C-alpha cells in the first residue's frame, strides 16, 4: 500500500509543472514522508516476523531436544509428579509358608476358617462373598495328576464348592434337578506347567435355589509339592463378577504359586 501511494503522488507532481516551487516542495515532501512511514511499518513487520521465526526455532529445538518425563501422563492417567517408577497399588504381595500370591489391596484378612487345612482368607471390604482362601493339606500324592483329571480332582475336593444344606423333597425353579437346591458347572479347566511344577486350574459356576448373587464364580488353582496339597480358591458373586470383581479374582488366582 505504501509504494502505491508514493507512485500516485509522484505522477501528480510531474503533470503540474506550473505550480510554484513551494507547492512542489510540499508535494515532494509528502511522498517522502509517506515512504518514511511505509519503511517504518515494514521494519515493524520484519521485526515481528523475525521474532516469530526465532521463537519457532526455539520451540522446535526444545521439542527435538526434550525427552518424555516420568511425570508425563496420558489422558485419564495419574501423573507421577516425582518422576519415580509407578508400582501396581491394586494388589499386595503375600508370602506364606511354601506359597505366594497377590491379594487385592482393598480386601481385608479374615479369621474365618471354612475348610480343613485353611491357612489364609482375605475378603472384600464391602462383600464377603468376594474372597480368597488358601489350603495346605498333607497328601501321599507325588503330583497333582495323581488325583486324575482336573474334573476328577474337583470331585475329591467338592467341599470347596459348598455342601448342600437342604435335603428333602423339593422341585426348585431355575433348572435344578428334583430334590436339588444347588448345582455346580465346570466352565473351564487346564493343566499348565509353571516353574517345572504341574498345576490344575478349574473355573466353576455354582448356583443355589435361593438365587443369592445369581451364583458364584469360583477359580481353583491346585498343585502338589513335598507331600503337601496346595489349593487356592478365589471367588466372587455373579453380579459383582460382571461389575469389576472378575479382574481381581482372576488376577489373584493366576498369581498363586508354590515357593
Swiss-Prot record:
Main localization is plastid
Q: Which residues form a coiled coil?
A: none
GO biological process annotation, one example = photosynthesis
Induction description? By light.
Residue interval of the organelle targeting sequence = 1-73
Record has rRNA-binding as a keyword: no
Q: Name one GO molecular function term.
A: calcium ion binding
Q: Which UniProt keywords apply?
A: Chloroplast, Membrane, Photosynthesis, Photosystem II, Plastid, Thylakoid, Transit peptide
- List the SUPFAM superfamilies hit by this protein, alphabetically: Mog1p/PsbP-like
Its annotated compartments are: Plastid, Chloroplast thylakoid membrane
InterPro entries attached here?
Mog1/PsbP_a/b/a-sand, PsbP_C
Question: What does UniProt give as GO cellular component?
Answer: chloroplast thylakoid membrane; extrinsic component of membrane; photosystem II oxygen evolving complex
Disulfide linkage: none
Q: Name one Pfam family in it.
A: PsbP
Q: Record's family?
A: Belongs to the PsbP family.
Free-text function comment from the UniProt entry = May be involved in the regulation of photosystem II.
Name under which the protein is recorded: Oxygen-evolving enhancer protein 2, chloroplastic
Q: Which organism is it from?
A: Pisum sativum
Amino acid at each position: 500500500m505504501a509504494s502505491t501511494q508514493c507512485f500516485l503522488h509522484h505522477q501528480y507532481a510531474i503533470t503540474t509543472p506550473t505550480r510554484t516551487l513551494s507547492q512542489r516542495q510540499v508535494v515532494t515532501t509528502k511522498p517522502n514522508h509517506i515512504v518514511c512511514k511505509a519503511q517504518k511499518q515494514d521494519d515493524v513487520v520484519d521485526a515481528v516476523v523475525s521474532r516469530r521465526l526465532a521463537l519457532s526455532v526455539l520451540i522446535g529445538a526444545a521439542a527435538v531436544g526434550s525427552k518424555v518425563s516420568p511425570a508425563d501422563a496420558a489422558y485419564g492417567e495419574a501423573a507421577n509428579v516425582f518422576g519415580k517408577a509407578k508400582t501396581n497399588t491394586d494388589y499386595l504381595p503375600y508370602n506364606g509358608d511354601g506359597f505366594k500370591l497377590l491379594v487385592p489391596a482393598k480386601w481385608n484378612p479374615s479369621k474365618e476358617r471354612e475348610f480343613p487345612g485353611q491357612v489364609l482368607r482375605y475378603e472384600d471390604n464391602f462383600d464377603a462373598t468376594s474372597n480368597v482362601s488358601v489350603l495346605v493339606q498333607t497328601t501321599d500324592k507325588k503330583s497333582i495328576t495323581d488325583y486324575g483329571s482336573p474334573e476328577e480332582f474337583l470331585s475329591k475336593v467338592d467341599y470347596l464348592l459348598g455342601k448342600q444344606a437342604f435335603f428333602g423333597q423339593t422341585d426348585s425353579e431355575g433348572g435344578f434337578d428334583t430334590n436339588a437346591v444347588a448345582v455346580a458347572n465346570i466352565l473351564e479347566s487346564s493343566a499348565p506347567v509353571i516353574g517345572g511344577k504341574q498345576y490344575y486350574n478349574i473355573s466353576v459356576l455354582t448356583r443355589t435355589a435361593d438365587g443369592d448373587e445369581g451364583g458364584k464364580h469360583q477359580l481353583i488353582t491346585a498343585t502338589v509339592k513335598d507331600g503337601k496339597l496346595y489349593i487356592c480358591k478365589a471367588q466372587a458373586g455373579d453380579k459383582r463378577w460382571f461389575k469389576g470383581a472378575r479382574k481381581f479374582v482372576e488376577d489373584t488366582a493366576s498369581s498363586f504359586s508354590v515357593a
